[in-house]
């Protein structure tokens, strides 16, 4: 439970069975990791999701990033880095510098752990910021929340995007007519 809620306090804790089962499952995934074929061969292809960070259980979007032609290998932005899986795939494909961003400190800690485990810390920089870092990149990836509804728990923020706010912010930041929103070169 320390992974999910931090160090234990002196008082007891009450939680639902659903939440407890989620904690147990998240702990198992974090301990064992998940094989990601786009990261190469075992055992050096595992991502270790943390509680509250979206787990890359569906690999279609990961494989798309692994297989798509790269416009450049100098720099890429990974918006909403989560576990760091897309940053890791890009770095393993030869992108020299990947900047991963997220607002959630738990996601950034998870991504940092995964990037270090994979030996990619010299290629991937992680920044706590809302959407885009400063500057421009020839490649920008993002796996945004896809359901336009309100999240009722922290883990759901990776799935639910109230009023499509993240998606709209991401699209607006790609090319904003020469202003601060021009992040894609």
Feature annotation, model-predicted:
Residues 1-35:
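N-terminal auxiliary segments of SAM/dcSAM-dependent transferases
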Residues 25-28, 50-66:
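Conserved SAM-binding loop and adjacent beta-strand
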Residues 29-51, 68:
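A short mid-domain helix/strand-loop element embedded in enzyme catalytic domains
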Residues 58-142, 148, 152:
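Conserved SAM/SAH cofactor-binding pocket of Class I
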Residues 105-107, 144-169, 173:
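Mobile active-site "lid"/loop adjacent to the S-adenosyl-L-methionine
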Residues 120, 178-180:
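Helix-to-beta-strand junctions that scaffold the AdoMet/dcAdoMet cofactor pocket
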Residues 181-185:
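Conserved beta-strand signature within the Rossmann-like core of class I S-adenosyl-L-methionine
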């Amino acid at each position: 439970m320390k992974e999910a809620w931090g160090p234990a306090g002196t008082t007891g804790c009450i939680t639902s069975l659903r939440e407890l089962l989620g904690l147990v499952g998240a702990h198992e995934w974090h301990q064992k990791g998940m094989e990601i074929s786009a990261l190469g061969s075992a055992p050096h292809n595992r991502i270790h999701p943390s509680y509250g960070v979206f787990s890359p259980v569906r690999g279609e979007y990961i494989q798309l990033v692994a297989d798509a032609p790269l416009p450049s290998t100098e720099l890429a932005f990974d918006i909403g880095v989560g576990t760091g899986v897309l940053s890791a795939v890009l770095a393993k494909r030869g992108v020299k510098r990947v900047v991963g961003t997220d607002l959630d400190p738990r996601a950034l800690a998870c991504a940092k752990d995964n990037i270090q485990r994979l030996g990619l810390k010299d290629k991937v920089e992680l920044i706590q910021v809302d959407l885009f870092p400063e500057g421009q990149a020839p490649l920008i990836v993002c796996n945004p929340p896809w359901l336009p509804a309100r999240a009722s728990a922290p883990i759901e923020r990776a799935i639910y995007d109230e009023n499509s706010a993240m998606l709209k912010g991401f699209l607006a930041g790609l090319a904003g007519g020469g202003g601060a929103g021009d992040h894609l070169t």
